Amino acid sequence: MAQVINTNSLSLLTQNNLNKSQSSLSSAIERLSSGLRINSAKDDAAGQAIANRFTSNIKGLTQASRNANDGISIAQTTEGALNEINNNLQRVRELSVQATNGTNSDSDLKSIQDEIQQRLEEIDRVSNQTQFNGVKVLSQDNQMKIQVGANDGETITIDLQKIDVKSLGLDGFNVNGPKEATVGDLKSSFKNVTGYDTYAAGADKYRVDINSGAVVTDAVAPNKVYVNAANGQLTTDDAENNTAVDLFKTTKSTAGTAEAKAIAGAIKGGKEGDTFDYKGVTFTIDTKTGNDGNGKVSTTINGEKVTLTVADITGGAANVDAATLQSSKNVYTSVVNGQFTFDDKTKNESAKLSDLEANNAVKGESKITVNGAEYTANATGDKVTLAGKTMFIDKTASGVSTLINEDAAAAKKSTANPLASIDSALSKVDAVRSSLGAIQNRFDSAITNLGNTVTNLNSARSRIEDADYATEVSNMSKAQILQQAGTSVLAQANQVPQNVLSLLR
């Protein structure tokens, strides 16, 4: 090896080795101080790229876990509002059950409806004002997507539904609306109600006054109706003619010769107190008669005594005593019971509803006048109409009864089957709450899975980029020793050219 001064090869070699050990020491210290095996791409280019992708996934999944927790919060907020809506619906149902009880007065029903209305308004308020981070969760149908993954499309959808009075089918819910008017309602709710019911018995038609019960014919100029005293048939005659008894038919002395002769023959030889019958009439002999049949006989009709004198039979011109007959009443046979009476007519009684029914009369429609307006009621009296429209009884704000037609009543008509309507609303709320409960459980599961994934990805990334302290400490110790040795050797190498100077002495 040549002895040169210009180039110290040993020094250069030592410097190079010293630089390497310095670089190794620097790398070890950097890794130990940062905790990372890869502090820059030069440390491990491929590993750095892989670790960076892991970092993206880890950060994305961590945020996704927070998103899922937000989803739980949204579901809890919505479900809490629905719980309050459910409480209001339960109270409305309770009030509706109370309202259907027949013991409630009009004021009771009004109070019940007032509270129901307040409850329904509260349901709408909860629907309109419940929100999460500025998003209203019950005021409209909405699908809210929650990002629960680190990549596109990894979402869970929360179905938010509009829940208010209208969507629940309770818009216009009413337990105290106007009810269909009946004839009974008109009589009880209004003053000075007049009118009549119509009946038909065969071809004959009648009217019955709804207040007095008087029966008249159904005509422009109605006639009063009576019940025939003899046969119970309906008639417009107020009396029936009784049958005159021939024996007492006349008061003239020239008449009744045949009757006188017949009576004379019956009492001939009779004694006082004897009785005999003639034409269904029982007579008593008042004076003893001889063989000529002359004498007096009497009978009692309607409590009044009637006396007949038979005289001048032997002369062949037997006559009823004129004076006696003129002071007595004509006698008739009643068409009702066949008894003798002084009345030439039997009075018929005014017909009543029961008489119409006895004659198999069939009830028809009714005409009812209220406050000057005439309404028509059907045969059963449970439907009242005006101009073809069904009438309802409503209450004014001051509680006064009033009649309105079906058009006006439609907007505030009582809800048909109110309990079924509320049950349907409760079922819808329950369905939405169940969905929200299920989605909360799903988010819980997603959060657990995300946590597991993040843990595993962190472990995988750690194995790639984290520093192994045992290895790095060993590397640092090795580099430190090499640094110390290199520095010492470099000093020796730098002394080698000094040996060449000895040749110049």
UniProtKB/Swiss-Prot annotation:
<dbReference type="InterPro" id="IPR042187">
    <property type="entry name" value="Flagellin_C_sub2"/>
</dbReference>
<protein>
    <recommendedName>
        <fullName>Flagellin</fullName>
    </recommendedName>
</protein>
<dbReference type="InterPro" id="IPR001492">
    <property type="entry name" value="Flagellin"/>
</dbReference>
<keyword id="KW-0964">Secreted</keyword>
<comment type="function">
    <text>Flagellin is the subunit protein which polymerizes to form the filaments of bacterial flagella.</text>
</comment>
<keyword id="KW-0975">Bacterial flagellum</keyword>
<dbReference type="InterPro" id="IPR046358">
    <property type="entry name" value="Flagellin_C"/>
</dbReference>
<dbReference type="GO" id="GO:0009288">
    <property type="term" value="C:bacterial-type flagellum"/>
</dbReference>
<dbReference type="InterPro" id="IPR001029">
    <property type="entry name" value="Flagellin_N"/>
</dbReference>
<dbReference type="Pfam" id="PF00669">
    <property type="entry name" value="Flagellin_N"/>
</dbReference>
<dbReference type="GO" id="GO:0005198">
    <property type="term" value="F:structural molecule activity"/>
</dbReference>
<dbReference type="GO" id="GO:0005576">
    <property type="term" value="C:extracellular region"/>
</dbReference>
<dbReference type="Pfam" id="PF22370">
    <property type="entry name" value="FliC-like_3rd"/>
</dbReference>
<comment type="similarity">
    <text>Belongs to the bacterial flagellin family.</text>
</comment>
<dbReference type="Pfam" id="PF00700">
    <property type="entry name" value="Flagellin_C"/>
</dbReference>
